[in-house]
Amino acid sequence: MSFPQLGYPQYLSAAGPGAYGGERPGVLAAAAAAAAAASSGRPGAAELGGGAGAAAVTSVLGMYAAAGPYAGAPNYSAFLPYAADLSLFSQMGSQYELKDNPGVHPATFAAHTAPAYYPYGQFQYGDPGRPKNATRESTSTLKAWLNEHRKNPYPTKGEKIMLAIITKMTLTQVSTWFANARRRLKKENKVTWGARSKDQEDGALFGSDTEGDPEKAEDDEEIDLESIDIDKIDEHDGDQSNEDDEDKAEAPHAPAAPSALARDQGSPLAAADVLKPQDSPLGLAKEAPEPGSTRLLSPGAAAGGLQGAPHGKPKIWSLAETATSPDGAPKASPPPPAGHPGAHGPSAGAPLQHPAFLPSHGLYTCHIGKFSNWTNSAFLAQGSLLNMRSFLGVGAPHAAPHGPHLPAPPPPQPPVAIAPGALNGDKASVRSSPTLPERDLVPRPDSPAQQLKSPFQPVRDNSLAPQEGTPRILAALPSA
């Protein structure tokens, strides 16, 4: 029998079944002798080579297909389709089932044949998603486009897609190449053009509204985060200045009525006004019959109606602050005489203060000089040490100013009814706070010295008792 598909017809023509039973060393020796005889060309080598060649081919193709060592193992018997018949025809299974039988070739040759034809996978030229290196031919097209657009080397999205198709490159590779080319041109100082921000350069990749229009693109380049913030602040300041002008125009007329009502009804503003010294021209200016004189003291400012424009006040105005402080910043500096050069405008040398820091503001309810009066009334029940002079009876001069206030009724009308012109500096200092009537409501004994002396004296004696006992103890120690 012959197997022409194996390429060995001359070796298997005269071979018989009895020739397959030789030992492996004898088979190898016979194969070597047959090869030597065929090379020398001696007569009789064909018959010798017939049996030896058949044994050699059988040993090569059927050495791993023998049923003896593999039939007993259950793992390998499943892979051998004719395990029972291979004992008689060991060469048949391997020769007819060359591709399917795992026993045909050893495990070292068990690799699949497909990778030999397509070494990079199922695609003939590799994965198409893998970016390919840019060659000199592909970059020459990009260089030609760059030379034509030296003034504006920013290709649009459509141009990038066209160049990517021509050069067989990806869109990212084209964009990166142009970015590097622009960087090289800037380093070489060969060309200068309007610089673009990175956001706009990335926006050109996905298409922008300013593509192909360099003038519009340059206008957009001037807008960045810092300029946007500054522009917004400038616009906001412009709106604030317009609102400030309106507030300044309405300010002289609006607080006039609340100031008059405050003096009549005894609000905290009235008590704060009493604390001011009355010898300054400001106190006389309150009784002036001209309308708006409480706010505008200079004739030039009264005629103009905008007294706060030249002042260095903050731009943010508070309507509540303007309403609660009718005698605000313009009263901080006394008005110059009529013949003075600064009569028609504010003096440049006079320091301007914010209304919150003026004595007339509602926050300053307690005068600094009368802080002791506040503490005496607040801590009277606790027996504060601040009242020690009144406890000991030494505070006769201190209690004298409080004499007129003891029979005074609780309502706040009596301190408000006093005219500003009738008060002098001493009486104004007595009026310490808008909560002055509340201090009078505190129950005060008629003779604090007589009533509070008796509980205070034992405390003093008790404090002296340990001092007298200490010398006795110290004297007894040396004697012991």
Curated annotation (Swiss-Prot):
Q: What domain of life?
A: Eukaryota
Instruction: Report the locations given in the UniProt record.
Output: Nucleus
Record keywords: Nucleus included? yes
**Which residues does this entry mark as bearing Phosphoserine?**
241
Residue ranges annotated as compositionally biased, kind Low complexity, are 252-262, 340-351
Acidic residues: which segments have biased composition?
A: 210-228
What PROSITE patterns would the database entry show? Answer: HOMEOBOX_1, HOMEOBOX_2
SUPFAM superfamilies of this UniProt entry? Answer: Homeodomain-like
Question: A GO molecular-function term, please?
Answer: DNA-binding transcription repressor activity, RNA polymerase II-specific
A single Gene Ontology biological process assigned to it is: positive regulation of gene expression
Supply the alphabetized keyword list: DNA-binding, Homeobox, Nucleus, Phosphoprotein
Q: What is this protein called?
A: Iroquois-class homeodomain protein IRX-1
Q: Which species expresses this protein natively?
A: Homo sapiens (Human)
- Which gene name belongs to this protein? IRX1
